[in-house]
């Protein structure tokens, strides 16, 4: 029961954001008519004119439709993360994590860390969302002159806006001029023990990553597609379900605990040292092995679709780069199934169907069939 309750808590901001989009139809701007409605996917939803725009305006668009729709979906996901309901849900979960710390003296300090630094971490997360790059990565937009994806250790180059935001007041008395890699000493008026801020920061970020129900969110995002005509709705739903999980993986992969805590608290990039928190068995459970392999399989096939036969093995291994936390497992999956994958990709028109044939994915729950396109 607790597991289901947590999933609905995390799903709530998504549903609220979709509901908010339709409830804002009274906006005076909507009175401008179709010229305003169809400027963007978000405006069409707000003015309850998505069906009109798809049938009368966007239905006559050129070959860049999929690219633009993908970017619009990314923008909607970005907006969801900015909703107060989403941020409140994350905050409440982290406050519960603070409350179960084994050393109760750390609880007020843990909450203080949340108050000061959670907004900065959320801003950093949102700053990693680049619609054009993400949609090119999943194959819905043409590849431009983009720079190669940085490796985790290369991400220390901090953009100027983020550097400006890092000038935040430190916790009173918590830091010295030269903080250590795992703890910051306290002043004499503070607790008479070293406070492991860096370990605490890394632990909380890892917990948030672990409890985000990616599959549930993907289905929730796809629900907006039910307001459009059946054929176009099927395309929209498959776009949302197929790529939302890939998008979340790409975004969460950039919120590496060591990197974020290094930026915010000037922590060392070394692994944190500290006692493990009690397991979250009452709240979450890991994805079943088949779900994990299904996710690996679909990502690998999506990555290899537009490559030559000679380049396929390299493309498949590159697909594992986005799974920073499970990269080794992904590499093992690719090595184990390489012959079957090489045989499936040239004939593949849908990643889920191909992975179902491989035996690592279950039958899709949705009755709508995904569209087929040479660009995917």
Curated annotation (Swiss-Prot):
What Gene Ontology cellular component terms go with this record? alveolar lamellar body; cytoplasm; extracellular space; lysosome; membrane; multivesicular body
Q: InterPro entries recorded for this chain? A: SAP_A (IPR003119), SapB_1 (IPR007856), SapB_2 (IPR008138), Saposin (IPR008373), Saposin-like (IPR011001), SaposinB_dom (IPR008139), Sphingo_Act-Surfact_Prot (IPR051428)
Where in the cell does this protein reside? Secreted, Extracellular space, Surface film
Q: Does the keyword Repeat apply?
A: yes
Q: Which residues form the signal peptide?
A: 1-24
In this protein, the residues bearing a glycan are 306
Task: List the keywords (alphabetical).
Answer: Disulfide bond, Gaseous exchange, Glycoprotein, Repeat, Secreted, Signal, Surface film
GO aspect biological process, one term:
response to epidermal growth factor
For the keyword Repeat, the answer is yes
Those residues forming the propeptide, per the database entry, are: 25-190, 270-376
The source's domain of life comes to: Eukaryota
Disulphide bond pairs: 67-141, 70-135, 98-110, 198-267, 201-261, 225-236, 294-361, 297-355, 320-330
Saposin B-type domain location is 63-145, 194-271, 290-365
Domain (Saposin A-type): give its ranges: 25-63
Subunit (UniProt): Homodimer; disulfide-linked.
Q: Any miscellaneous information on file?
A: Pulmonary surfactant consists of 90% lipid and 10% protein. There are 4 surfactant-associated proteins: 2 collagenous, carbohydrate-binding glycoproteins (SP-A and SP-D) and 2 small hydrophobic proteins (SP-B and SP-C).
**What's the stated role of this polypeptide?**
Pulmonary surfactant-associated proteins promote alveolar stability by lowering the surface tension at the air-liquid interface in the peripheral air spaces. SP-B increases the collapse pressure of palmitic acid to nearly 70 millinewtons per meter.
Designated name of the protein: Pulmonary surfactant-associated protein B
What is the protein's species of origin?
Rattus norvegicus
Q: Which gene encodes it?
A: Sftpb
């Amino acid at each position: 029961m607790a597991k289901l309750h947590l999933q609905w808590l995390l799903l709530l901001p998504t549903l609220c954001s979709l509901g908010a989009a339709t409830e804002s139809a009274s906006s005076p701007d909507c009175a401008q008519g179709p010229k305003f409605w169809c400027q963007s996917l978000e405006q069409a939803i707000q003015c309850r004119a998505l069906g009109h725009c798809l049938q009368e305006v966007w239905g006559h668009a050129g070959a860049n439709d999929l690219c633009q729709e993908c970017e619009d979906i990314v923008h909607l996901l970005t907006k969801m993360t900015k909703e107060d309901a989403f941020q409140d849900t994350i905050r409440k979960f982290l406050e519960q994590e603070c409350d179960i710390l084994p050393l109760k003296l750390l609880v007020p300090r843990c909450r203080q860390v949340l108050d000061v630094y959670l907004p900065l971490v959320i801003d950093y997360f949102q700053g990693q969302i680049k619609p054009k790059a993400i949609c090119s990565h999943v194959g819905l937009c043409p590849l431009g002159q983009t720079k190669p994806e940085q490796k985790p250790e290369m991400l220390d180059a901090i953009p100027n806006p983020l550097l400006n935001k890092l000038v935040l007041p430190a916790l009173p008395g918590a830091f010295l001029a030269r903080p250590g890699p795992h703890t910051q000493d306290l002043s004499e008026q503070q607790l008479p023990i070293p406070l492991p801020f860096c370990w605490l920061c890394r632990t909380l970020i890892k917990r948030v990553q672990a409890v985000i129900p990616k599959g549930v969110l993907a289905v929730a995002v796809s629900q907006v597609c039910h307001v459009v005509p059946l054929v176009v709705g099927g395309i929209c739903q498959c776009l949302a379900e197929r790529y939302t999980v890939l998008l979340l993986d790409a975004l969460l992969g950039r919120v590496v605990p060591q990197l974020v805590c290094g930026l915010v608290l000037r922590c060392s990039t070394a692994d944190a040292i500290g006692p493990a928190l009690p397991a979250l068995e009452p709240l979450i459970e890991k994805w079943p092995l088949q779900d994990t392999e299904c996710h690996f399989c679909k990502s690998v096939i999506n990555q290899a679709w537009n490559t030559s036969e000679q380049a396929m093995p390299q493309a498949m291994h590159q697909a594992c780069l986005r799974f920073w936390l499970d990269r080794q497992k992904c590499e093992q999956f690719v090595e184990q199934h390489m012959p079957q994958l090489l045989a499936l990709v040239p004939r593949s028109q849908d990643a889920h169907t191909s992975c179902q044939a491989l035996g690592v994915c279950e039958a899709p729950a949705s009755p709508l069939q995904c569209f087929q396109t040479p660009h995917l």
